[in-house]
Structures are given as C-alpha cells and as structure tokens.
Amino acid sequence: MAAQVDAVILAGGMARRMGGNDKGLVELLNRPMIEHAIERIKPQVKEILINANRNQNRYSEFGFKVFSDQDSGYLGPLAGMITAMSNTDAEYLLVVPCDCPLLPTDLVARMLAKLTAEDAELAVASDGKREQPVVMLLKPSLRESMKAFLDAGERKIDFWYAKHHYVVAEFSDQPNAFVNVNTPEQKQQLGEAIANEENH
C-alpha cells in the first residue's frame, strides 16, 4: 500500500524583503505565487494544508484547510510545521514554502524513496549545491522533538533536523526547482524563467 502523504505549504512569514506583502499572494505570471506551488504539489499528496498568519480568508479560497501558528510570535517556519503536524493523520508530512513555483513534480516520490531506503526519520531536499531546509518530508511523530526544541528557545530548522537521522534527496537535475522569491527583482527573473520554460 502506498504511503499516505499530506503537504503543508508555509505562507506564514513576514516577507520583509517583499515590502511586507504576503508572499504567497504576490502575483507571478498573473497568478498568486502559492497557486504555482499548489499546482505542482497537489497530484503528489492526499491533502494540502496551508499555514498562513494573515489573509486567511483569501487563502481559504484555494479550497484547502488553512491554519495559523499555534504560537502567534512569528517563530519562523518551525511554528507552522509543528502546527501542521497536529493537523494531519498521514504517515508523512511534506513541507514546502509558498514561494517556490518550480517545485519538482516528482518531489514526494524521490524524497520518500530516499527516506525509506535508509530508514530515516526525515528527508531534506537539495538542489545539488545546498540543502533546502524548508523543503522536507518528515514523520509527524517528530512533533514532540520539535516542541522541545522550540520550548528551549531554538528556531533554526537545520539545527533541529541535524538532531535526527535525516537523508538528503538530491535534485541537481532540476537546478531551478527550489528557486524562491525574496525580492521584486527575483520575482521578475523567475517570471521570465518560467515563461521561457513554457515556450520550449
């Protein structure tokens, strides 16, 4: 039987470098950024959850469950992840950011294969050059470990997952897969890259 995988799209950040605009709702090629991520992820998972701390009515229009961080202090991505772990009964949870419009269409398959082959607790994606800490596949049972980490005042994702048996899933064959948008300039460059991809 195929493993059950749910996904959470993290849209809870402050997006200071985008002028404070809600990154998931910033338009790229006339569509909200998160819509690109949803399109890529939806065929790969059972359910999609959206973690958003503002504009929740707008996010709910996409037809998926929307939730805010249990702790309202903007503790970074881990706060959204730990809340998502409480909102899924799937065997695995895929975590992706809302501003990666070129996510691999085989993301879950490759991460799950790597994780199960090495009997790991979580898999982290890599573009071949560096790990992508907010693109991971993990077991929701790791929630208690993450809670203890946050309770100790820690915030950095890579510090947390380094405490566990994790594997790195390489996507060097898709170098743009995890390109994200932090500035208006990056948004323009990415829009041009996607348009080029669609024209070939």
From Swiss-Prot:
One of its GO terms (biological process) is bis(molybdopterin guanine dinucleotide)molybdenum biosynthetic process. This is Molybdenum cofactor guanylyltransferase. One of its GO terms (cellular component) is cytoplasm. Mg(2+) binds at D99. HAMAP family: MobA. Coiled coil: none annotated. Keywords: Cytoplasm, GTP-binding, Magnesium, Metal-binding, Molybdenum cofactor biosynthesis, Nucleotide-binding, Transferase. GO terms for molecular function: GTP binding; metal ion binding; molybdenum cofactor guanylyltransferase activity. Its cofactor is Mg(2+). Monomer. Transfers a GMP moiety from GTP to Mo-molybdopterin (Mo-MPT) cofactor (Moco or molybdenum cofactor) to form Mo-molybdopterin guanine dinucleotide (Mo-MGD) cofactor. It catalyses: Mo-molybdopterin + GTP + H(+) = Mo-molybdopterin guanine dinucleotide + diphosphate. GTP binds at L10, A11, G12, K23, N51, D69, D99. It is found in: Cytoplasm.
